[in-house]
Amino acid sequence: MKNINFNNTQSYQDLKNHFRKIKNIHLRDLFASDLNRFKKFSIIFENEMLIDFSKNRITDETLIYLLNLAKETDVKSGIKLMFSGAKINKTENRSVLHIALRNRTNRPIILNNCNIMLEVNALLEKMKNFSKMVIHGEWKGYTGKSISNVVNIGIGGSDLGPYMVTEALRPYKNHLNMYYVSNIDGTHLTEVLKKINPENTIFLIASKTFTTDETITNAHSAKKWFLHYSQDQSTLDKHFFALSANIKNALNFGININNIFKFWDWVGGRFSLWSSAGLSIMLSIGFDNFEKFLDGAHAMDNHFYHTNYKENIPILLALISIWYTNFFGSETEAIFPYDQYMHRFSAYFQQSNMESNGKSINRNGQRINYQTGPIIWGEPGTNGQHAFYQLIHQGTRLIPCDFIAPVFSHNDLNNHHMKLISNFFAQTQALAFGQSRDSILHRLILSKKNQDDIKRILPFKICKGNQPTNSILIRKITPYNLGALIALYEHKIFVQGYILNIFSFDQWGVELGKELSQNIYNYLNINIKNKSYDASTEGLINFYKSFMI
């Protein structure tokens, strides 16, 4: 890996100089001066997905400098390292091989002198056989009833990803009721337990380490609830399953060895939906649709690996993101799926991006003096239009946005989808081109308002525009297309981290809070005080404890 700070490259200096020239150019002028702009700055993926990046504040020259940055930092070598199984997660000494889980060509991937595809295929076969038994009613609960409810207990990647995909592919869902429990707040589990019957429910305990406090606490409570009804430890074999790399801990919990679906340390948690952690997805949509989901991701993997810099969608989107965070000074990026089934998509990539690239130390162990990962947020359209779009249109911040929409809806109710897609098109147009003073003045004059009213209201109606967007139009949200879309964003995040000279596959910042939490829990629970707390924390603890007397 080339461990160079990107702001020490010639490309960075070129971009810095170039930015001074174009920072005030308006998108109106960029489109007016180039009638082929859309054609030049858009790519179609497999005739299923259009990526339009023409409404970005870039020129042909910008793109040349950005692509030079990718070449100078040797992104293609980084891609090859990841796909080959090199241990690019240096701080944990691990390979990063979620791409192996969707390697549909069965190309051998050698790790520690073993072809890991043999294990991957064996796991997929085990998941397939189990899911078919559950879906077809052949897997019985302890009283002989077929399974109707599936409860996935996990957090982070073991929850956000599977939950997002299950919701996004709800049109492909079978009869099984899917529930997801993540929060250690007892309310989350309690509300799910109210809805289910222990006789026809299975629990999937999704934890790579099988030590995650939130997950194991919820799992123990679910187990206690279940045994209250079954009154027999052996009945756990019919109802509890582990999706984990830690076989020993799963066995100690009481999970039957045959009920453990393996995980590997080369699969990062936030990429785990492709692994056994995706069992809830398979149970929801069936094995055939899950295979199509993997196929779509694999197709994007091939595009990412084989396509040149200039036409490589993840590379282009990553470069454009870096352009805004490090030259325009934008702090956030928004993702707006115009599809209600995709309502958890933004939240999933909030975790995936911010946990991956929320770093301030470079790969050489030195503090960074430039911006790394942006803050990711978003909601489905059109809800967001009536909540926060106002700030994007007329606020003081530059917020690059991704708009995602299907051409065909799964629920084309009357003319609902045409109205939805009209909003999609209108918002990207309004953000790019705005509404100038002259056009507003003309409309106000035509409305026959008096001069005083026009003068008073005119400044407030101006929308400056020049807000950048990417538009991603997908023929339909199918398992295949969703798989490709998720892989696109995953690879975009990888490229960003690689260029920014950070390790994208660890999350040490998450660990500190866990450690402190355990110390405080010991103090609250058994009055063991391991250390002195700051005045604020001490005051908060004392206030809490005053109610426990």
UniProtKB/Swiss-Prot annotation:
- Read off the InterPro entries from this record: G6P_Isomerase, G6P_Isomerase_C, Phosphoglucose_isomerase_CS, SIS_dom_sf, SIS_PGI_1, SIS_PGI_2
Q: What class of enzyme is it?
A: isomerase
Question: Where are the catalytic residues?
Answer: E355 (proton donor), H386, K514
Q: Which GO terms describe its cellular component?
A: cytosol
Q: In which pathway does it act?
A: Carbohydrate biosynthesis; gluconeogenesis; Carbohydrate degradation; glycolysis; D-glyceraldehyde 3-phosphate and glycerone phosphate from D-glucose: step 2/4
Q: Give the transmembrane region(s).
A: none
Record's subcellular location: Cytoplasm
Which family does the record assign?
Answer: Belongs to the GPI family.
GO biological process terms, semicolon-separated: gluconeogenesis; glucose 6-phosphate metabolic process; glycolytic process
Q: What does this protein do?
A: Catalyzes the reversible isomerization of glucose-6-phosphate to fructose-6-phosphate.
Keywords from UniProt, A to Z, are:
Cytoplasm, Gluconeogenesis, Glycolysis, Isomerase
- The organism named in the record is Buchnera aphidicola subsp. Acyrthosiphon pisum (strain 5A)
User: Can you say what this protein is called?
Assistant: Glucose-6-phosphate isomerase
According to its UniProt record, the EC number is 5.3.1.9
Q: Would the keyword Isomerase be found if you checked this record's keyword annotation?
A: yes
Question: What NCBIfam families does the record point to?
Answer: PRK00179.1
Q: Which reaction does it catalyse?
A: alpha-D-glucose 6-phosphate = beta-D-fructose 6-phosphate
Molecular-function annotations in GO: carbohydrate derivative binding; glucose-6-phosphate isomerase activity; monosaccharide binding
